């Protein structure tokens, strides 16, 4: 038995369609709860490579260094160490998107005797380190000793030296005060004063000549040049040695045993040279050198 045709369903009203969609909202909410929550891209992931690849590079300000890590999100920029913001005082201001400013370092040198150490990043107080860059210099102990020795030598050379008297003028100056003393001896009626005689008890010690130098304690420096009278025997001895210097025993040579074979060969060689000189133009080259075959 065929079924009777069914009439089409009536068109629902707009209010009824909205009422039908309301019960679907709890189902949609249940589907969302089942799905895992999506993490934002800015947070760190569980794996280290994916975290470094997905994390966008942090933008650094003009005062931060390239090697300095970005500040954590919970720390304020005022809590950062002051050393990181110090180079910004010398570096010219740059726009925010231009990148980073190069780190500025200076090297402070200590004394040359103890070696030098390099300072870290420059502080903001003072002129810019680009104007006066200093470098460190490490010296070994041997180099320090060499530098100190040269410094002392320069100080000794810089001191003024006392002029030494010339040897030709020194005997004349020492003998000049002795001439009046010799001339004054016969006038007083006493014996002539002998400069080489020892002092008597009444006269006491002789006064040192004005040109003599005195050391501490009254010691007199011996004279450098002797008197002209004492030079004569020394001159005679030196002349005798110069004239007979080969007559000494140490210069005599002992007679040695003569090698007769060597004398014979030398004699034959000399005869061959004489015969070759006589027959140079007549004989050949080998005939003129007969002495070569005798050796």
From Swiss-Prot:
Residues with PTM Omega-N-methylarginine: 83, 188
InterPro entries named in the record: PRR18
Keyword Nucleotidyltransferase tagged: no
Biased composition, class Pro residues, residue ranges: 1-13
Region (Disordered): 1-133, 181-227
Keywords assigned by UniProt, alphabetized: Methylation, Phosphoprotein
Compositional bias per record (Low complexity), positions renumbered to this chain: 14-29, 103-126, 181-192
Source organism, top-level taxon: Eukaryota
Modified residues (Asymmetric dimethylarginine): 172
Residues modified to Phosphoserine: 47
Protein name: Proline-rich protein 18
């Amino acid at each position: 038995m065929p079924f009777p045709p069914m009439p089409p369903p009536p068109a629902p009203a707009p209010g009824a369609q909205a009422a039908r969609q309301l019960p679907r909202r709890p189902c949609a909410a249940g589907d969302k709860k089942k799905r895992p929550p999506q993490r934002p891209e800015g947070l760190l992931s569980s794996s280290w490579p994916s975290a470094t690849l997905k994390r966008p590079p942090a933008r650094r300000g003009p005062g931060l260094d390239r090697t300095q890590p970005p500040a954590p999100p919970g720390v304020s920029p005022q809590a950062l160490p002051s050393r990181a913001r110090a180079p910004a005082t010398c570096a010219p201001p740059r726009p925010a998107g231009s990148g980073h400013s190069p780190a500025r370092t200076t090297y402070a040198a200590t004394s040359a005797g103890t070696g030098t150490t390099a300072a870290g990043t420059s502080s903001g107080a003072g002129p810019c380190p680009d104007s006066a860059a200093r470098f460190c210099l490490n010296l070994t102990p041997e180099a320090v000793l060499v530098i100190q020795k040269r410094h002392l030598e320069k100080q000794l050379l810089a001191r003024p030296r006392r002029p030494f008297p010339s040897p030709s003028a020194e005997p004349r100056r020492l003998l000049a005060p002795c001439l009046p003393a010799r001339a004054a001896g016969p006038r007083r009626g006493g014996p002539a004063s002998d400069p080489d005689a020892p002092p008597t008890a009444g006269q006491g010690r002789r006064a040192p000549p004005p040109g003599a130098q005195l050391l501490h304690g009254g010691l007199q420096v011996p004279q450098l040049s002797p008197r002209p009278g004492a030079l004569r025997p020394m001159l005679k001895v030196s002349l005798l040695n110069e004239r007979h210097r080969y007559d000494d025993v140490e210069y005599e040579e002992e007679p040695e045993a003569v090698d007769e074979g060597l004398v014979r060969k030398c004699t034959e060689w000399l005869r061959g040279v004489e015969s070759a000189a006589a027959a140079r133009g007549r004989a050949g080259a080998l005939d003129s050198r007969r002495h070569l075959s005798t050796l």
